[in-house]
Every structure is written in C-alpha cells, then in structure tokens.
Amino acid sequence: MLADIRYWENDATNKHYAIAHFNVWNAEMLMGVIDAAEEAKSPVIISFGTGFVGNTSFEDFSHMMVSMAQKATVPVITHWDHGRSMEIIHNAWTHGMNSLMRDASAFDFEENIRLTKEAVDFFHPLGIPVEAELGHVGNETVYEEALAGYHYTDPDQAAEFVERTGCDSLAVAIGNQHGVYTSEPQLNFEVVKRVRDAVSVPLVLHGASGISDADIKTAISLGIAKINIHTELCQAAMVAVKENQDQPFLHLEREVRKAVKERALEKIKLFGSDGKAE
C-alpha cells in the first residue's frame, strides 16, 4: 500500500528505529526490496534518482514502482532522491513519486534555503513532503580526500534552516559519503546530537552502505530516522551475477532478486523497522 513518509519518519523518530530507503532502478532490485519488506512486515521507501536514468527510463519504470507499492502488503513510499532542480522533482511527482528530496546542498546557506523553500511552497499544498540537505554529502571519491574538504552540517544553522524552509525532514552530513568507502567511515556523532536537539523534524543519513552495524545503531539511538542504502544492494547483486554467470539468464535474474532481498532484509532488521507494519 502507498504510505505517507511523514507518518513513518515521525514514528521512527519517536520509537527509536529507522525506516530503510533503497534506491532501485530495475525490476530485480524493486522486487527484491518489496519481497524483503513484506517478509519483515516493515514499511519501506523505494527511490529513484537522476544517476540511474542512463540505465532505466524513469517515466516508464515509475509505473512499476507505483503499481508494486500499491499492491504491497506493507506500507511503501515512492521517493525521488537528490532532486537538484524543480523541473526534476516536478517530473518525479507527475510520475507518481509521493515523497521528494530537493537537494540544494551544493549551494551556500541562503541559496539552499531559497531553493528548498521554493520546492516546499509548491509541493506542500499538493500534500507532498520535501526532504532537504544541510551540509553536503559528496559522491564516491577517495574518502580521505573527501574528509579533508568535507562540509559538515552546521548545528548552529539547522534550526534556522528548518524554520525558514519548512522542510519535512533533514539529511545531515556527518562524515558520510555516497558510494564505496575507501577507508573506515569516521562519523561525527556530536553533529547528530546537536542537530537533533536543535530541530523537531526527522533526520536522514545518506551514504550508509559500508557503515558499520555499531555506527548505524548509534546513529539511530541519537535520532536518525531514515537511512539510505544503494551500493550494498548493487554489491549483493554483483556477487549473485558472478556466482551464476554460467546459468541461464532467467535463473540469474531470480538469483539477483534473491540476493537483493537478503541484503535488504539484513538492513531492515538492523534498522529495527521489522514488525512495525504488523
């Protein structure tokens, strides 16, 4: 069933678990994630983003995302990740995404506020929630180099940002990074604590693939309510491909779906959302 992300993010915040956000851009990933959520009786977020349009036509794939969300036996949110323009997120909304991220984190503070508020002012009257980002979670690179110039979320700006934009949730930059970490992630949990104390909206952790289970649990205990996973699903799928490369293609596809399901199930249980949709 299609669900409202605001309900589940607030529930996660209040009950100290996190809802899993999985980027999906083909049938095997989508079905594997839904399989996992249904088995775990967990709410789940299925998401698409600009980085995947070279592999999949979003305008076509979105129909499958929405259809499977509607038919699922658990609450499912359809989300657009890292929308870097109004045109992009408007297109996502017109194709059935019921949650949007307006990512203007690459801009300075005032421009981030302006662009985020523009999205909020447009989509809130339509009943669509908007996630924003303060600080900047970069893309895959040498992790040590990324840390040298890392733009952490400024806790002193968080309350003003949320108040002026009206965003529904806030992605924080605490040493996390998209893609594969080239060394052990070094997360600044003091930033999470201070931002959590400063704002009332749910907090989001991007780039969580490769972060240790212990650090994930710490982040959740400090108030992270939504956690984004993509790279680990891809890694699980690639292992399945390698192990079944001599098998018929139909068999290989089923094994990829199973591998994605198993990895998604691990994350759902780690985040503590299993059983929440019973």
Curated annotation (Swiss-Prot):
<dbReference type="GO" id="GO:0005975">
    <property type="term" value="P:carbohydrate metabolic process"/>
</dbReference>
<protein>
    <recommendedName>
        <fullName>Uncharacterized protein YdjI</fullName>
    </recommendedName>
</protein>
<dbReference type="GO" id="GO:0051289">
    <property type="term" value="P:protein homotetramerization"/>
</dbReference>
<dbReference type="Pfam" id="PF01116">
    <property type="entry name" value="F_bP_aldolase"/>
</dbReference>
<dbReference type="GO" id="GO:0016832">
    <property type="term" value="F:aldehyde-lyase activity"/>
</dbReference>
<dbReference type="GO" id="GO:0042802">
    <property type="term" value="F:identical protein binding"/>
</dbReference>
<dbReference type="InterPro" id="IPR000771">
    <property type="entry name" value="FBA_II"/>
</dbReference>
<dbReference type="GO" id="GO:0009025">
    <property type="term" value="F:tagatose-bisphosphate aldolase activity"/>
</dbReference>
<dbReference type="GO" id="GO:0005829">
    <property type="term" value="C:cytosol"/>
</dbReference>
<dbReference type="InterPro" id="IPR050246">
    <property type="entry name" value="Class_II_FBP_aldolase"/>
</dbReference>
<dbReference type="InterPro" id="IPR013785">
    <property type="entry name" value="Aldolase_TIM"/>
</dbReference>
<dbReference type="GO" id="GO:0008270">
    <property type="term" value="F:zinc ion binding"/>
</dbReference>
